[in-house]
Amino acid sequence: MAAVSVIPNGDEFHLEGGAIAVLMVHGFTGSPASIRPWAEALHREGFTVRAPRLPGHAQTWEEMNKTRWSDWYAEVDRNFSELKKKYQRVFVAGFSMGGALSIRLASIRGQEIEGLMLVNPSIHDPRASMKLVPLLQHVIPSLGGRGTDVAAPNPPKHSYGRTPLRALRSLQKLWKVVQRDLYLVDVPLMVGYSVNDHVVDPKNSEMVIDNVSSIDIREVIFERSFHNVALDYDLDLLVEESVSFIKDVLSGAVNRDERDLIDAEFDAIVSGLSLDESAPTTYLDELDEIEAAEEYRGDNKPLPTLSSTQRAALVGVIGGPLYAVSVQFLKFDPLGLGAWPGAIALFAGIVTFFWQMRPDNDDDDGVAL
C-alpha cells in the first residue's frame, strides 16, 4: 500500500460513473489535488474518473528523489490497463508532466485510447539553468521551489515546496523520449495551454501540435489563467471544452485516422463542398502577428527562474574553481591573494546550497510541472 499523502486531498481517487472512463494524470512534484476540480466536474457529467498518485509524489522530496520516470509511467500504464478491463471506452487526460506521461502512453497504446486531452503539457525546457541539472544532481539533492503559478488568489496546497534534482534529471530524460516519439501519436487530441504560463512555455504545446500525427486536433487557449488551469479562473472553460471533446469523439464527429479523413473528403466532394487542406494555423502563430495586445497578468507576478541567492551560489560553485585554476596555471592573480578567493567562493556556494536544503515550510507550495 502506498504511503499516505502529506498534501491535503493529495491521495489518488476513483469517482465511479458511467461506462466511459477518463484517466487523469497530475504533474511533477504535484498530486491528484492539482486536477481534482477538473476531475469532479467530469464526474458530474456522468464519466468515471480515476486520478492515480504517481510514485514518490505528495510525500517528501526525499522520497521522490528515489523514483524515476519509468516508475511514474508504470503507474499510469497500470491504471489504464485496469480501466480498459472494466469500461467500454477510456480517455486519457494529462496536466504538465502528466501530459508527457499521457503522450508516452498514447505513443505505445494509442489504438486503445479513445482520445487524449493535454493541459500545458511539459515536454522540454530550454532555459539555461536546466542545463546545469545533470551536474547539480550530484552535488545537491534539491532546490527550493517557487510559488504556485495560479492567477486566482489563495490556491489550495497541492505540492511540496522543493524540487528534487535527481527526479528532475529523470524528467529531462522522459522529455527526450516523448519528443522522439511524438509522430507515433495519432489519437484524437485536445491541447489546452495558457498564454501566461510561467512554468511551462506555451511553445511546448506548439511542439506537440506540430509533430503528432493526429488528424483532428482541438486547440484551447486559456487567457485568464497561469500554469495550473484546474485551480484557476479558466476551470469552467477547461471543463466545457473537455466535455465537448469527449462527446464529439464518442459521436464520431472527430476523425481518428486517414480512412476517416478520406471518407469525409469523399462525402464533401459528393455534396459539392470543399475541405480546407492548408496547414492549420495555431493561436501561437496568430500572437506573432498581433502588434499590441493586453495580457491578463492576474494577481501573481512572473516567477523568477532562480532566486538571487541561488544565482549567487551558482556563481560561487562555478566561478570559484575557475578563478583558482586561472591563478594556479595561468598565473592570473588580479587580487594578489593567490587561489584563496576562489576557494572561499566555492565553499560559500556549497554552504549556500546546503542552506537551501533546510526543512520545508509547510505553508509554502512548490510549482508542479
Where are these regions (language model features)?
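Short, surface-exposed "cap/lid" segments of acyl-processing enzymes
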Residues: 3-60
